[in-house]
Amino acid sequence: MLDTNVDEETVRRIVREEIQAALEKDPAKKKAAIIASKGTLDWAYPPLILSTAAAALGMEVAVFFTFYGLNIVHKDFESKLRVSPLANPGMPMPVPMPELANALPGMQGMATMMMKSMFRKKNVARIGELHEVARESGVRLIACQMTMDVFGYRQDEFVEGVEFAGAASFLSTARRGHLTLFI
């Protein structure tokens, strides 16, 4: 019979031990490169959650934020990261909505508010908390310098700990990794 009364620390210890054993078998898997190119609230979570999870597994992680993905690490991320129900046909809505209704003014704000509320109810970390976890975990958050130049962003407009580099510099880092994700 499966013991469901195992404490959280025991589970974490077992997972760490299993991951460490796997990494020792294949040390090339110790590096991950993630490219984040989308700048909406629902697309902000995957690169931050995956990068912090990879770091927790002992991997060296670099996340390259380019184009609208820069919104994720911009100081003004709270207002920049929104959800568009029009662009998310699979988004669960509490009340079925005709597609045309999603284009009405105010629907983006309502969808954003609903998603934040769902995350709060399920105790999902906020984006700012994930920034902090990433920094503390040693995840390299890298903003694309070319995209910053195109959009007119300055380095002081980004959250603490963000590095700035071009695509060639990031690719030099990414080519040494075993895992590369484009989000």
Range-by-range predicted roles:
Residues 34-44, 118-122:
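Short, glycine-rich nucleotide/cofactor-binding loops
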Residues 7-27:
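Heptad-repeat coiled-coil amphipathic alpha-helices that mediate oligomerization/assembly
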Residues 45-58, 63:
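Histidine-anchored nucleotide/phosphate-binding helix
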Residues 108-169:
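A charged, amphipathic interaction segment
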Residues 31, 60-62, 140:
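Residues at the starts of beta-strands that form the adenosine-phosphate
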Residues 73-82:
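Glycine-rich loop at the start of a catalytic domain that most often binds anionic cofactors/ligands
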Residues 81-119, 123-126:
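A glycine-rich helix N-cap at a beta->alpha junction
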Residues 61-67, 144-145:
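Short internal beta-strands
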